[in-house]
Curated annotation (Swiss-Prot):
Its cofactor is [4Fe-4S] cluster; [2Fe-2S] cluster. Residues 38-256 form the Radical SAM core domain. The gene is bioB. GO terms for molecular function: 2 iron, 2 sulfur cluster binding; 4 iron, 4 sulfur cluster binding; biotin synthase activity; iron ion binding. Keywords: 2Fe-2S, 4Fe-4S, Biotin biosynthesis, Iron, Iron-sulfur, Metal-binding, S-adenosyl-L-methionine, Transferase. It comes from the Bacteria. Homodimer. Pathway: Cofactor biosynthesis; biotin biosynthesis; biotin from 7,8-diaminononanoate: step 2/2. This is Biotin synthase. [2Fe-2S] cluster binds at C97, C128, C188, R260. Pfam families: BATS (PF06968), Radical_SAM (PF04055).
Length: 345
């Protein structure tokens, strides 16, 4: 794009330092230039393989290095995953994300992963996976199966990264994103607020994301979910205004990307979530959990949507179509969501 901005750290920090209301106004203006401000993309995330991850990410309850009480589960059978996808679609999701606690996928598991992608695609849903690092041929195989998105977060700035993770380098994360993009899969990549980072680190993360050769189509911004047994369990709470600022700056720096209000929503007030939508967030995960951490139930999300006049994207509804919203509400309330998970990684 001829008019694309390549951001400096100083420019990003200047955005964080703007008066709050000015920042919100700018973010909302930019959001309206690229998106319908009343539509929110809705995804569901399922943990298809839980626990026993060899990585040492200090925030993650699925690491084998920490005692967090997480039950370890092997890779789910394909039909189990497809059953969950059917329920997610019935509950209103348009994208089904599948996450596995691996450093990288094993070759023996690739045929099953391909079948999962093909099966979910056949339902008319978008597909996303987060499986750790990928080799070139693995990315190509997932692309051939029809995978739409691959999630691989950068987590934080390059400077702070080594304080949080030592078993995978920042460059390895960037290399995986490059392989995903090279295979023709859309990129989902973001980070976490509340790791103990500074505002400069938050700015540095967003600079890394915005200055990728092609910015991510989807940018999940997570609030740290503190889990007992992880090294970050006693971190200070994130000030809601600091989190909202991060959403707003992400929207300004990546105007055409979906900015996902991701992990941590269970601990946010409705008012904080509303301000995040005002700041430019236009995607959420919903379901009972995000991987292994709590997430607001679907009926609670829908009630908030109704209060704010928001519509789940691609529901075939016109603005204010209360009958359609009521039908969706009934689907959400009746859906069995116990196996759906909330994504922090």
């Amino acid at each position: 794009m001829a008019d694309r901005i390549y951001w400096t750290l100083e420019q990003a920090q200047d955005l964080f330092n703007k008066p709050f209301l000015e920042l919100m106004f700018e973010a909302q203006q930019i959001h309206r230039q690229h998106f319908d401000p009343r539509q929110v993309q809705v995804s569901t995330l399922l943990s298809i393989k839980t626990g026993s991850c060899p990585e040492d990410c200090k925030y993650c309850p699925q690491s084998s290095r920490y005692r967090t009480g997480i039950d370890t589960e092997r890779l789910m059978q394909v039909e189990q995953v497809l059953d969950s996808a059917r329920q997610a679609k019935a509950a209103g999701s348009t994208r089904f994300c599948m996450g596995a606690a691996w450093k990288n996928p094993h070759e023996r598991d690739m045929p099953y992963l391909e079948q999962m992608v093909q099966g979910v695609k056949a339902m008319g849903m978008e597909t996303c996976m987060t499986l750790g690092m990928l080799h070139h041929d693995q990315a190509e195989r997932l692309a051939s199966a029809g995978l739409d998105f691959y999630n691989h977060n950068l987590d934080t700035s390059p400077e702070f990264y080594g304080s949080i993770i030592t078993t995978r380098t920042y460059q390895e994360r960037l290399d995986t994103l490059d392989k995903v993009r090279g295979a023709g899969i859309k990129v989902c990549s973001g980070g976490i607020v509340g790791l103990g980072e500074t505002v400069r680190d938050r700015a540095g993360l967003l600079v890394q994301l915005a200055n990728l050769p092609t910015p991510p189509e989807s940018v999940p911004i997570n609030m740290l979910v503190k889990v007992k047994g992880t090294p970050l369990a006693d971190n200070e709470d994130v000030d809601p205004f600091d989190f909202i600022r991060t959403i707003a700056v992400a929207r300004i720096m990546m105007p055409a990307s979906y900015v996902r209000l991701s992990a941590g929503r269970e601990q946010m007030s409705e008012q904080t979530q509303a301000m995040c939508f005002m700041a430019g967030a236009n995607s959420i995960f919903y379901g009972c959990k995000l991987l292994t951490t709590p997430n607001p139930k679907e009926d609670k999300d829908l009630a908030l949507f109704l209060k704010l006049g928001l519509n789940p994207q691609q529901t075939g509804t016109e603005f204010g179509d209360n009958q359609q919203q009521q039908r969706l509400a009934e689907q959400l309330i009746n859906a069995d969501s116990e196996q759906f998970y909330n994504a922090a990684v």
